[in-house]
Amino acid sequence: MAFKPLHDRVLVRRVQSDEKTKGGLIIPDSAKEKPAEGEITSVGEGARKDSGELIAPAVKAGDRVLFGKWSGTEVTVDGEELLIMKESDILGIIA
């Protein structure tokens, strides 16, 4: 199933965190925090100004981004857990 976000929303795939700490300790699944880093998989057409003019999104599919810990809504598309969020929930693009 293809999924295309509407307006200024984006679809994000979380990037999995490391299984070990820098010191070599293995982190169990129950102690892991959900990562606040992901890859944009799909982007809506953008927001509209009051005049109706379209504001193009600043992100594109394939961008790696950081977002707030509680940002977005979890959705399942083709058996994969993704996040859908507003572009304004994105804190920045990782270069």
Curated annotation (Swiss-Prot):
Keyword Chaperone attached: yes
Superkingdom in the source lineage: Bacteria
Pfam family, one: Cpn10
Entry keywords, A to Z: Chaperone, Cytoplasm
InterPro entries: Chaperonin_GroES, Chaperonin_GroES_sf, Chaprnonin_Cpn10_CS, GroES-like_sf
Protein's GO biological process: chaperone cofactor-dependent protein refolding
Ranges that cross the membrane: none
Cited SUPFAM superfamilies: GroES-like (SSF50129)
Classification via PROSITE patterns: CHAPERONINS_CPN10
One Gene Ontology MF term: protein folding chaperone
Compartment list: Cytoplasm
Keyword Ribosomal protein: no
Location of region: Disordered: 20-45
Major localization listed first in the record, in broad terms: cytoplasm
Gene Ontology cellular-component terms listed: cytoplasm
Biological role: Together with the chaperonin GroEL, plays an essential role in assisting protein folding. The GroEL-GroES system forms a nano-cage that allows encapsulation of the non-native substrate proteins and provides a physical environment optimized to promote and accelerate protein folding. GroES binds to the apical surface of the GroEL ring, thereby capping the opening of the GroEL channel.
Record HAMAP family: CH10 (MF_00580)
PANTHER family: 10 KDA HEAT SHOCK PROTEIN (PTHR10772), CO-CHAPERONIN GROES (PTHR10772:SF58)
Family: Belongs to the GroES chaperonin family.
Assembly and binders: Heptamer of 7 subunits arranged in a ring. Interacts with the chaperonin GroEL.
Name by which UniProt lists this protein: Co-chaperonin GroES
